UniProtKB/Swiss-Prot annotation:
Organism whose genome encodes this protein: Burkholderia ambifaria (strain MC40-6)
SUPFAM superfamilies, sorted: Composite domain of metallo-dependent hydrolases, Metallo-dependent hydrolases
Pathway: Nitrogen metabolism; urea degradation; CO(2) and NH(3) from urea (urease route): step 1/1
Annotated binding of Ni(2+) 1, by residue: 135, 137, 218, 361
Highest classification ranks of the organism: Bacteria, Pseudomonadati, Pseudomonadota, Betaproteobacteria, Burkholderiales
One CC-aspect GO term: cytoplasm
Cofactor note: Binds 2 nickel ions per subunit.
Disulfide bonding pattern of the chain: none
Gene that specifies this protein: ureC
The protein's name in its UniProt record: Urease subunit alpha
Amino acid sequence: MTLRLSRRAYAEMFGPTTGDRVRLADTELLIEIERDYTIYGEEVKFGGGKVIRDGMGQSQRVAADVPDTIITNAVILDHWGIVKADIAIKHGRIAAIGKAGNPDIQPGVTIAIGAATEVIAGEGLIVTAGGIDTHIHFISPQQIDEALASGVTTMLGGGTGPATGTNATTCTPGPWHMERMLQAADGWPINLGFLGKGNASLPQPLVEQIAAGAIGLKLHEDWGTTPAAIDNCLSVADDTDTQVAIHTDTLNEAGFVESTVAAFKGRTIHTYHTEGAGGGHAPDILKVCGEANVLPSSTNPTRPYTINTLDEHLDMLMVCHHLDPSIAEDLAFAESRIRRETIAAEDILHDLGALSMLSSDSQAMGRVGEVIIRTWQTAHKMKVQRGALPGDGARNDNFRAKRYVAKYTINPAITHGIAHEVGSIEPGKWADLVLWEPAFFGIKPSMILKGGMIAVAQMGDPNASIPTPQPVHYREMFATRGGALARTSLTFVSQMAADAGIAERYGLAKRIVPVRNCRNVTKADMIHNAWRPSISVDPETYDVIADGQLLTCEPATVLPMAQRYFLF
């Protein structure tokens, strides 16, 4: 007997299917389901009178043969596709993406459900990989709470707390600080990795930081990013298979952007805030987007360009870089970094895939909880101002969505050598997953999973008779408590440090994971974000020309994903 359902009725019961479209929050962005792994009439759903019951959708298989958790009928949005599927999680990892059910009585089942299987209802929800923020100033540990609640599950950067050096630079300097920060990482339900200070002209001060556990090194102009320091730092990185991140020389004291590029010598490097408002050769650091060995990212205060962007940056910059507004030279330094023309061009370079990643610059000219929001606000602004991208059309923005989601998931993972563990929703990877109601997509996740266990969720009054009564707000769940914390989150270190046994020497509880393949990455590896234009910046007008085209756009006067969703 066959029952025909309308698309609306089907979507309300099992979530959208192939050809259905979903609006992302209150933006103008629409995604369309490209494939449905489930089978019509054989869908599984949990609840009273539903399918996942003993002898029906639940089989008799033992724990070894079934997942620990399934997310049913979810819409997956990832760099590789936009699909509807059931997601299986086993031993903290994504085990399969496919069709769940009871293979004894149902056709086409690729994921067997058993008595050992927990169910998370994904009907009508969007699932993305946990975000990766690669520009963290570890100024206050409370940043981690904000980041996790926003959908970020991995934080990479440097610092030691609210020290003056950390307020300005993302460096955890020296073996002693590195050991202490790695020990502190055991207390937080998020994946962490730390960058050492890369500013030295001889290798040993850098090698000892890698040996102590640094996943890479950070070159910052406030410590002196000279060509000699750049060359030495990259040489150490090549020898240790670690990444280098750089904040270049805003004042052009030791050379211009061409001098910095020459010091790279074709070696891989991650350029932070590549537009320059966050720091870097004024006014033309954007030129490095055309280099094959440069992996460029933005920080979120300039994302997207709005009528308020310029006004907030001056005071923000003065505080972050320990400048004095009463000193003319300090004021000139600050003003040289804030250029409306290059900020406007930054929007377009993101939309065209020339800027590959987006990060926060947390508490140091950036907002740790707004990486994901500002990524999608930029995508919306570009859709409104520039129309559909090639490959998209009137029906959907699938390619644009894949391009933008890659900026804070897979591309940062590839850049920093952790893509074998995190950064996408693929079998074998750590199950760091974020569930969103479409109306709140990118803004307020419903639930965040770490290593296959619920870490943070929107939860109502714990004394209520059901989970939903007010006040509903983000609360930490069982993955953040006791021994579960150390078994659901990762600490990334260098291979050198892992081989030297720092986990035992430091007494670390979390699983440590060595970074790898950091030195053979090129711009071509930046998924959906590999464009290498030839860029010039007029030194007087700051006009940005990319492959002969003037890049300019108007500032936004209103944005989605903003006051509609927040009381304050």
